[in-house]
């Protein structure tokens, strides 16, 4: 849920003349898990809604609108493509079970291009195949570091495609469904994370540049209380508001300008 360093967006902008942007709230997010638990609690849903609204605003600043749908991803994509006159879709490649199943269903109804953009290292740049990844993190890290870190440069859209007009499409109801969780009760003193790429960037700047907490990470990383004993980048990474490559680029700049 970001525009900066978005390889899927970058690939789309280089290959199409006009485009529409669609975000799908998967209906399975509201269904209980196989063990009967909620898949998405109020805090996570609140973060998601904020992130989508932030993306919508960022797209408006580029002259584009965001179509927001709720339902089965393949069904929603096909309906939106038919209504918008689109013949292909671009999106970020996923690697988890339900997401790859959704990708397969989408591919069965429309031409789809899935672009790697979720990880720091592109799978093609790893010194081993995905099937040969070590099961222990430290072994994986050592193997990758010995092979040399091959991190691809950040990408940015220079020429935006012409926006497809979607004013006549009234896709409503999703915000009303989530409205009650926009401001869930918060225990005093609990950490509250604000969704969106801008909020993620503010946290990145605060942790590195405003407080230089990165320099004390080894001393504080085992903490359990408070906001600043670790980076707390995870919520923004999980929803794609920040990319791992953006963080790596800023950490590298920090090491060069402040402290290695």
Question: What kind of feature is each model-predicted range?
Answer:
Residues 1-155:
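Trp/Phe/Arg-rich N-terminal binding region typifying the photolyase-homology
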Residues 131-260:
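Glycine/tryptophan-enriched, flexible segments
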